[in-house]
């Protein structure tokens, strides 16, 4: 086993997983700023605000950029499904999760501001009843794949979820996006298509305004996604400037060059394709049933 692989394997042996509040905080900021706007645009701007501001990092020996949370091995406490109670947080702390005192205090402050403002604050209770009563789904709900894990059917999961990724909340269905479309055309093709649709839109139909909001939202999200990749390019270049080891400096500069290209442009080689795929996957998550699809075919 190569030394790099051995070190990365050892880094996976962690006993505690940090709970992060950055995404919760940024979501709250965005929802306050966009109050009264169409929901399609609110969600798009929320997504962009998170991608533009969430903490990013590149760890030692990384060759691909992108983490699903603001801390290594972290889980972002989700904002979509209601506030987090102290009992829920204490339950997680008693298991394999940890949260800093500062973040825990901030979480409770966000709860007070966020109560009733989440995008799906009534969904947990309504879905929880049906999911908890389904014998086939009960082992899944109890597993903790959606945090916090259900202790019993009566108690359910409570109000919050904590997961990894920058999608707009956890899903309860199988999700498989068209990775090949990004690999072959890049985000550039989707942005250009959205702009063309906006240009050609004629306000003759009842849903014309909704179509405009949708295409504007597509542009907002995909342009933010490209900026997210460029943030990693900036970070890799900064780290390379401070790096004294020539081999690692070269690796960081190569990572920066790749992030300048993908996901905006189509991938031109396998390394770029891997990075483009991973950025795409981060945008799909969190969802307990996200899938990479036919990786063997489109790669």
What annotation goes with each model-predicted range?
Residues 1-202:
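Long, non-catalytic protein-protein interaction scaffolds
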Residues 179-299:
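Structured, charged N-terminal subsegments at the starts of enzyme catalytic cores
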């Amino acid at each position: 086993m190569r030394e790099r692989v051995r070190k990365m394997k050892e880094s996976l042996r962690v006993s505690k997983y940090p709970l992060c509040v950055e995404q919760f905080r940024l979501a709250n900021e965005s929802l306050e700023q966009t109050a009264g706007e169409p929901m399609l645009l609110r969600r798009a701007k929320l997504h962009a605000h998170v991608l533009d501001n969430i903490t990013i990092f590149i760890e030692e020996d990384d060759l691909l950029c992108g983490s699903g949370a603001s801390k290594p091995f972290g889980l972002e406490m989700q904002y979509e499904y209601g506030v987090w109670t102290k009992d829920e947080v204490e339950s997680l702390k008693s298991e394999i999760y940890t949260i800093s005192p500062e973040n825990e205090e901030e979480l409770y402050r966000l709860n007070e501001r966020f109560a009733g403002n989440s995008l799906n604050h009534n969904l947990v209770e309504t879905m929880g009843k049906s999911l908890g009563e389904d014998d086939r789904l009960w082992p899944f709900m109890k597993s903790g794949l959606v945090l916090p894990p259900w202790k019993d059917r009566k108690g359910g999961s409570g109000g919050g979820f904590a997961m990894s990724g920058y999608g707009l909340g956890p899903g309860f269905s199988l999700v498989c996006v068209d990775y090949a479309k990004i690999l072959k055309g890049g985000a550039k093709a989707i942005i250009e298509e959205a702009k063309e649709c906006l240009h050609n839109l004629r306000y003759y139909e009842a849903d014309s305004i909704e179509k405009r909001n949708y295409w504007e939202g597509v542009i907002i999200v995909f342009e933010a996604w490209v900026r997210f990749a460029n943030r990693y390019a900036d970070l890799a270049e900064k780290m390379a400037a401070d790096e004294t080891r020539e081999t690692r400096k070269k690796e960081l500069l190569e990572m920066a060059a790749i992030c300048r290209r993908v996901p905006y442009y189509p991938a031109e080689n396998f390394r770029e394709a891997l990075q483009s795929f991973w950025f795409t996957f981060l945008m799909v998550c969190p969802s307990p049933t996200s899938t990479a699809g036919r990786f063997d075919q489109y790669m």
